[in-house]
């Protein structure tokens, strides 16, 4: 009862803190002179310099600061494939097909350097140029398909994509690979269906863009298999669309997908039968950390979506209340650009988002409410206000299909996955910008400010907080106190304890785990197995792995993977999994029967 009352008091305190923050912030905004709001972008050079500095800070911080077990998983699954483990048969990771792309970079690095020193940093160096390239392609595509849009607005949309990633992870792993391939596929479709001349007239697209879209769609399915739903939606779009070239368009889009799928299945069938492939697919789908009933999943989605809807609804009601109070009761006008439909709502949502970044318990970048708000408002604008940008409205719908497809395979809730709506937000900005410019002479400036808010806000959120810290919601300035000195994470700055633990494990690993061992690592940080030359005894390396009977199935199919060394994550001999109710501990004592136990500060090693 005391705990319940304490939780209620904490919740009430946070709500009160949020209300006070909003009142003070909105008071400041509404008290500003109209001239300030009208001229906020007057000095474009200063704002360009601010944007450049924000992008530099964002890039440098995320290149050198922060480390996370999710990032380690993304590297480890690629490393397994690069070192010769086979898909499906020896690798049971749920995201293993995405490792095809990661493994290329890892294999190249290992060939050039002979080891994994600085590998994490190298993969981050690969990430940022690719992210910048997709952002530049987005900018050029917006300029080609929406020629009436201001060049600065299109540039800000490109920058918004650059500073928004699905997670606070900056390597070519499954979430970022999906983000790139989905964006490239969509942008190729826009190039084909939405190309316009300088006078705004639609011109016939070239079929090569549909071919490229099909190739990127295939890559996207490999990065995130549930994206097959996006493929089906695009297929339906091509089928129902009236076109004299319908069958050519279908062939151009579908044949690359079919050909790529045929190559993939041919490769898999080169070392296993179709029956074995189906058996392995069942084992992978049975991965414990992603196993929930339909009811549990729907309940979790409903709770998260309800929370998000409540926040956005409250923001909308507050914005309508402020407008009514000022215009109807006080008989005055809102300051400057806040008069535009929806602008006050976006400002309030942004202020709530800032509060989350500064004071809430959410880690790093979440929950990105403004991306959801802009996407939904873009839909509303097209349906109820201005039906000019039909193609971008359809893009918003496709972005929501993408969002739902990610939810199907993820063990994260809807509020944490809003970052996958980045292209929906960009399309929403296009719909809003076109409508605002028709409604008000200040519409051009308003969409510039909204884009600027999004860019600088996201650059701040991804820069302000450190990922992977021992403290869940921790600030970079206060917490960066350590450096990972050698090995996989060499050169990366983290909080003191994360670096200390890594460096300690790095120092003891050669003594604790002999090279050539077949190692079962029990714990979320399986990337430590990359500190030596080992064979992987675990079916998968996901950081949320459940250690259950799947291990026995894996060793029955792959008897050469039965471990001779078992490593538990621990704290000075204290093992979380120790106890008679633990499957892995019972297996260790009854079947593995260790002959030797070695306790180190952060790992405990058992040998036969």
Task: Label every PLM stretch briefly.
Residues 125-147:
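Transmembrane-helix motifs of polytopic, lipid-linked glycan transferases
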Residues 63-77, 86-105, 117, 272:
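Extracytoplasmic catalytic/substrate-binding loops of multi-pass membrane glycan-assembly enzymes
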Residues 93, 227, 457-545, 563-574, ...:
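Short periplasmic/luminal acceptor-recognition loop of GT-C membrane glycosyltransferases, typified by
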Residues 177-200, 209, 216, 372-375, ...:
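Specific aromatic-rich, kink-prone transmembrane helix
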Residues 49-54, 245-269, 300-317, 332-349, ...:
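Hydrophobic alpha-helical membrane-interfacial segments at the cytosolic entry of transmembrane helices
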Residues 120-124, 158-180, 353-364:
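Aromatic- and kink-enriched transmembrane "portal" helix at the membrane-lumen/periplasm boundary
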């Amino acid at each position: 009862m005391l705990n319940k009352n304490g939780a209620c008091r904490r919740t009430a305190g946070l709500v009160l803190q949020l209300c006070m923050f909003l009142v003070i912030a909105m008071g400041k905004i509404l008290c500003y002179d109209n001239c300030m709001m009208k001229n906020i972008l007057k000095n474009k050079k200063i704002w360009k310099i601010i944007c450049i500095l924000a992008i530099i800070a964002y890039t440098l911080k995320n290149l050198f600061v922060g480390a996370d077990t999710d990032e380690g998983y993304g590297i480890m699954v690629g490393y397994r494939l690069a070192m010769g483990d086979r898909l499906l048969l020896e690798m049971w990771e749920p995201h293993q097909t995405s490792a095809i792309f990661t493994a290329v970079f890892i294999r190249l690095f290992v060939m050039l350097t002979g080891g994994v020193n600085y590998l994490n940093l190298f993969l981050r160096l690969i990430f940022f140029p690719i992210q910048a390239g997709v952002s530049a392609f987005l900018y050029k595509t917006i300029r080609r398909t929406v020629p009436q849009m201001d060049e600065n607005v299109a540039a800000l949309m490109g920058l918004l994509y650059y500073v928004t990633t699905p997670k606070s992870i900056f390597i070519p792993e499954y979430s970022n690979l999906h983000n790139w391939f989905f964006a490239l596929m969509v942008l190729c479709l826009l190039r084909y269906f939405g190309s316009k001349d300088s006078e705004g007239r639609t011109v016939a697209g070239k079929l090569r863009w549909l071919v490229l879209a099909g190739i990127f769609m295939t890559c996207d399915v490999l990065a995130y298999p549930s994206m097959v739903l996006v493929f089906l939606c695009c297929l339906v779009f091509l089928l129902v669309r009236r076109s004299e070239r319908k069958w050519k368009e279908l062939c151009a889009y579908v044949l690359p997908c079919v050909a790529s799928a045929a190559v993939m299945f041919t490769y898999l069938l080169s070392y296993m039968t179709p029956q074995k492939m189906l058996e392995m697919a069942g084992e992978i789908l049975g991965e414990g950390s992603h196993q929930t009933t339909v009811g549990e999943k729907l309940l979790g989605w409903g709770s998260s979506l309800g929370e998000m809807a409540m926040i956005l609804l409250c923001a909308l009601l507050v914005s309508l209340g402020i407008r009514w109070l000022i215009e109807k009761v006080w008989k005055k006008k809102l300051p400057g650009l806040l008069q535009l439909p929806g602008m006050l709502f976006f400002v309030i949502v942004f202020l709530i988002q800032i509060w989350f970044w500064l004071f809430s318990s959410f880690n790093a970048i979440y929950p990105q409410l403004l991306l959801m708000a802009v996407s939904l408002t873009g839909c509303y604008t097209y349906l109820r206000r201005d039906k000019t940008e039909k193609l971008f409205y359809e893009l918003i719908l496709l972005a929501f299909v993408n969002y739902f497809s990610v939810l199907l395979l993820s063990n994260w809730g809807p509020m944490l996955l809003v970052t996958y709506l980045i292209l929906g937000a960009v399309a929403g900005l296009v719909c809003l910008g076109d409508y605002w410019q028709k409604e008000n002479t200040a519409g051009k400036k308003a969409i510039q400010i909204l884009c600027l808010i999004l860019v600088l806000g996201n650059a701040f959120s991804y820069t302000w907080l450190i990922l992977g810290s021992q403290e869940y919601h921790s600030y970079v300035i206060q917490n960066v106190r350590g450096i990972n000195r050698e090995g996989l994470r060499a050169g990366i700055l983290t909080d003191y304890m994360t670096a200390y633990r890594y460096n300690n494990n790095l120092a003891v690993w050669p003594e604790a785990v002999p090279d050539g061992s077949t190692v079962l690592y029990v714990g979320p940080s399986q990337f430590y197995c990359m500190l030596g030359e080992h064979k992987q005894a675990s079916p998968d390396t996901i950081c949320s792995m459940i250690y259950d009977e799947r291990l026995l199935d894996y060793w029955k199919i792959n008897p050469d993977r039965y471990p001779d060394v078992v490593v538990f994550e621990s704290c000075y001999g204290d093992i979380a999994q120790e106890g008679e109710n633990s499957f892995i501990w019972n297996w260790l004592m009854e079947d593995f029967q260790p002959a030797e136990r070695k306790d180190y500060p952060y790992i405990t090693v058992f040998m036969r």
